[in-house]
Amino acid sequence: MKHPYHIVSLSPDGKTMYAAAARQVDRICLETGECKSTVVEESATRTTTKTGDKPAAAKRTKYLPTSVSHVRSLQLSKGGKYLLATTDETKSLVLLDPTTLEVIKKVQYPKRPSAVATDKEDLNIVLGDKFGDVYGESVEDLLKVEGELKDEPVLGHVSMLTALELGYDSKDRPYVISADRDEHIRISRFPASHVIEQFCFGHQQFVSSLLINDLDASILFSAGGDDEIFVWDWLNGKQLQKLSLREHVESYLNEAHIYVDKKGVATTHKEITVSSLQQIKDTPYLLVNVESTNAIIVLKIVDNKLEVASVFATEAHVISFSVAGNLLVTSEVGSEGVKAYTITDGVVTKSDKEIPFGSCEYEDDSELISLFSTKSLRKRGEF
């Protein structure tokens, strides 16, 4: 049985594609077709528990099933020195060599990682977890850690961390930009992250994507469970724009987007969840995918505002996408291999490039991972 790639990520030059399927990571050279694979996570064995404290309880020992730890995120560090993977059951950050896929270091965190970012020199890594804590460590110190990280977090939110970025001001001073499930975007100094510099308020739903403008580092884009993409002057906490996507994706929404009310009754309203927001490096173009749709929306930055340049229909629902230069790759539902597209002046067309890789083998359903999970961040009222 085959598990599709649930993450695809291109190198900045577009010559290499990294991908994750369940607990496997692949490195595909797009020029030669060579594929290297590594299993980042073995099965995580859960401990057994007894159902009582009497001698006979030994006969009633409850054996919990072995769990499978999946790769939850996969990305190159900003400087390109490391391939970073995070896992769920083992709560780990794994540093891989981008060329060989050799595991350089595996560090276990107290709670499950939910977001990770690096500085531009690859000297520091910040990682947020599902309980809202953010850890900031130098790579040098991480390489010395044995077992679980014991350091204290550098900052904390009251809800799950959903996205992280490291930004810089005009004097090249670093800041942690952190977002959570409670619609908050916080700007904190780094490494003195107890000093909160600013908040960016405006989201009504969770924030799952943060992106600093490659052409102007003072501008931040954010998206998540709202209909809109937000544009910020992040250091001043000023909202510059919010661009609605609804009219552009309405025809692509389906039963997966239907809102079910507190009584469990399906309504006519369909909810939008942005699963990914990426910029084509050194260009004014951004690409957006709304989860569980077969649409890629191309946005253009004009005077620090966004406008829709085009909407492209893919062959099937997009699981994950990545862009580098004029190359766009997508992992799509039911596809035998990764799809390749060409982007020219904001217009997407089908490419002649063939990428036969798009999945890995799995043995049982415990290895399957949810392909469309971003929408689960949306909070529901009590019945």
UniProtKB/Swiss-Prot annotation:
Gene3D superfamilies: YVTN repeat-like/Quinoprotein amine dehydrogenase. It is found in: Nucleus. SUPFAM superfamilies: Quinoprotein alcohol dehydrogenase-like (SSF50998). The keyword Thylakoid does not apply. GO terms for cellular component: cytosol; nucleus; tRNA methyltransferase complex. Keywords: Nucleus, Repeat, tRNA processing, WD repeat. GO terms for biological process: tRNA (guanine-N7)-methylation; tRNA modification. It comes from the Eukaryota. InterPro entries: Quinoprotein_ADH-like_sf, Trm82, WD40/YVTN_repeat-like_dom_sf, WD40_rpt. WD repeats lie at residues 66-105, 156-200, 202-244. Pathway: tRNA modification; N(7)-methylguanine-tRNA biosynthesis. Its main location: nucleus. Belongs to the WD repeat TRM82 family. Required for the formation of N(7)-methylguanine at position 46 (m7G46) in tRNA. In the complex, it is required to stabilize and induce conformational changes of the catalytic subunit. Forms a heterodimer with the catalytic subunit TRM8. This is tRNA (guanine-N(7)-)-methyltransferase non-catalytic subunit TRM82. It comes from Yarrowia lipolytica (strain CLIB 122 / E 150).
